[in-house]
């Protein structure tokens, strides 16, 4: 026999394949005393997110497989929440406690599942809103009488007392002590179910976290949300506990165990903006035991300083607009002073350019024969890289690329049509990214997904979230960089470089460390000569700049004949700050 509650949390996973709770494949957490579970309103399958806090049923309808899996998941969501927050009694001698739970809570949960499924399908609510309703219905904190939890707790106490009276006299002393300890803990567990103040606090904090998650997902652009979720996607405790093979076809929620009184106090003291930042840090992988009063105060200071900077920036822009308006009015009053007004506007424009230049972290660099602007970081600050011929190949015309691939040894590219080559050139001809990868700021943009061995060589993969814009088409995804070390110099050689279009749902797999082991090229020709990235001459019309305001690195392709025409741009997003 064993009892699982606050000291051991047994978390069941919904097996979509069999429509059942897979209790034999569960994860046991050991939270600190006083910590409670906060469930994050994201549903995962394997590495991928299939439901966001903002997801509505109409969104799920776009993917039939997700609708089926989610419906099955909702049929068990109360059991999952119960296991996270309350815990279960496991008595191995017989199933009396299991039968008691089914009798007192099981039928109630079944009715609850039907109600919330109907509410979600027929209504226009979000998943985070649905999760808040599930919490309210499970714990029934607004009821003073006839709470299902309280009645269930009373029955546990009664059953425990009966078991205490009926302990056989022939049971030896060791087993008697063990049973006595179990029954004492069991009685406390039953009593705790009537502690409405505790469950009310859990429900309140869960609502606060759900609201923060929904606001994060609503406020951020798709690429900003992707960089946030990508950063934390490899830090999921539950996925690590189950392992890759056991969880690929299962739906699960993630949670954090922490002192929820601190979150409640922080919300009262600092408000929603600080809670929102705290939840962001949790999504980035912050552990529950690391969240204390000192850390919360630190986050509050960061948020307050950020808000102060934003206010100052808004004031500067407002004053600048007012000065512009005054300048134009003065120009209209003086018919003779038209040229003077133009000169004033020109000076104003120059001032703006200077201010923008002061804000830029690294000034724009025009390459391909153009003079580099002063202030650029010296070559000594940059990392040395080499470029493999298979990467440089994409700089050539589609006809030449096809000819070389057809003669090459890589099966995946041989025999591709010219149209396919033209399409792939858009995603592979991004050598300008190496300008960022060489810089000291590379780690601010790229995540290292780790090293692996394939085809007899050790390789490394870096990824960054990006946005590729071509005409009116905007594509979000990841910039992938594959490298190995040149022998004997040890200099990194970039053999793979591309922009991979992906959405939030598939992003987990793409940034997963195991992804390149399946998708990467089997064999690399390591005997070829590699070109030094620092000596590479970029074509006319390609421009690189770091945009500090949006924390992004941008490559802009312009028409060489008309540089005012932008053909394509790639913006690499900076990684979100970890506090």
From Swiss-Prot:
Region annotation (Disordered) maps to: 321-384
- Identify the domain of life: Eukaryota
Question: Where is the secretion signal located?
Answer: none
Give residue spans, biased composition: Acidic residues.
Answer: 350-361
Where composition is biased (Basic residues), the residues are 326-335
InterPro entries given in the database record: DUF3654, UPF0329
Which family does this protein fall into?
Belongs to the UPF0329 family.
What name is this protein filed under?
Answer: UPF0329 protein ECU02_0080
Q: State the organism named in the record.
A: Encephalitozoon cuniculi (strain GB-M1)
